[in-house]
Structures are given as structure tokens and as C-alpha cells.
Amino acid sequence: MNNIWWQTKGQGNVHLVLLHGWGLNAEVWRCIDEELSSHFTLHLVDLPGFGRSQGFGALSLADMAEAVLQQAPDKAIWLGWSLGGLVASQIALTHPERVQALVTVASSPCFSARDDWPGIKPDVLAGFQQQLSDDFQRTVERFLALQTMGTETARQDARALKKTVLALPMPEVDVLNGGLEILKTVDLRQPLQNVPMPFLRLYGYLDGLVPRKVVPMLDKLWPRSKSYIFAKAAHAPFISHPVEFCHLLVALKQRL
């Protein structure tokens, strides 16, 4: 049975949908869900094949976006972290009337490094894909450790991420591989130039997966969007800086 796991909580006239990153699930938001649900009607989602959304194989980005939309409110702020940022962006491109505002967190429209573009080296992503078939739990843990490296709270942030992964059944290897394939191949730099809704991009200065060099490049490419860098955060600013993170989202709501 292919069912997306979906939880709605809180009250507010503005809906906020949170989409997690690769290898994880919606439990990753528990550090901020109480605060956010006092300002928004909050929607927590396990992406297809992750967490409690079982019964899915590897999906393309477009199919993942369509699957998530099935249970979504008519209109919401869509916030996506890392891989989830690509899913939220895809929804903004294909169903702009459903997106009140787009927020991407530690996400890139093109995660893979190109000649003219900083990112994760393609051979690193290919290496992760290879290692998944050998020892996928260890590979996922390595990927999580990369996400918090360099921050003052790196150890406890990494522990929080690991706890999130271990709280629920691990995704199937083909689902994890499919997610890496999306990170390796998708490039939304040009399409996202024309999104009509407010667009907020949040980054960690110490992020080892989304280099801060992309921020001014995207400021130039997407002049209508706004960017913000958490000075002491890495790839998971909502875990290391929850108060500041929630404040930015409440401020966005007040501007709508």
C-alpha cells in the first residue's frame, strides 16, 4: 500500500508544510514543531519511501512531488530541507497556485558540482551510491556526520540526526539510491528564475554539502528571492539554531 505519512498540528490561518532531507524522516522537525505549531497549521510529512511512507520504490523528483501533493492543503508555505528543498521547488514550479511562499533550507538547485558551479563532487555522490549496497546503515551515518561538521554543537547535532534515523525503519536501498540520483542529476537553476511567489533561501555558513559560494551566485540569478546565512550553522540550522530559525519563518508569515 502506497501511503504518504502525514501529520497536521497547530492552528493558524497559514499552512506550513515541512519536507525533510535524504535518509531522514519527519521526526527531524521535533526540535521546532511545538514552536511553529503555535504560529502555523503545521504539516509534517515523510517523503515517499522514507520513515512511515512505505511501499514506494525509487521515484523521480517529479513523481515524488506529485505523491506529496496528494494530501497537501490547497495553499501553503512549502519548506524543504536539503533534498526536500528540491521537492518543494518542483511543486512551486509545477503547481505555483498551491504555494503561498517557497522556503529552501541548506538546499541547492543543483547539488552536484559543475564546471561553473560549486557543489558536491559527482564522484563523492557516486561513491555514496556504491557504499550503500555494501553497508547502507554506515553510509547513511557518514552522510549525517557530514551535515553537522564544523559547528560548535556538531556532536550533539549529529546525535540528534542519528536518533531521528534510528527511530523508524530504515528506507530501502533503492529509495536511498533514488534520492542520491536526484541530488546527482537535477538542476533547477534556470527554471526557478521565474517562480512568482515569495522565495526565501536559508543557508549555514559552515555547510559542507551546499557551499556558501552558491549564495551570491543565486542572489544574482534569482534577484526576487531573499537569502539568509546562519553564521555558525552547517547543514541543519533548524537543529543548531532553532530560535533564530523559527523567528525567520514567523517574520515571513507576517510579510505575506
Swiss-Prot record:
Protein name listed in UniProt: Pimeloyl-[acyl-carrier protein] methyl ester esterase
UniProt key word Cell inner membrane: no
Cellular localization per UniProt: Cytoplasm
Annotated function: The physiological role of BioH is to remove the methyl group introduced by BioC when the pimeloyl moiety is complete. It allows to synthesize pimeloyl-ACP via the fatty acid synthetic pathway through the hydrolysis of the ester bonds of pimeloyl-ACP esters.
Pathway info: Cofactor biosynthesis; biotin biosynthesis
Residues that hold substrate according to the record: 22, 82-83, 143-147, 235
MF terms in GO: pimelyl-[acyl-carrier protein] methyl ester esterase activity
PANTHER family to which the protein is assigned, alphabetical: HYDROLASE ALPHA/BETA FOLD FAMILY, PIMELOYL-[ACYL-CARRIER PROTEIN] METHYL ESTER ESTERASE
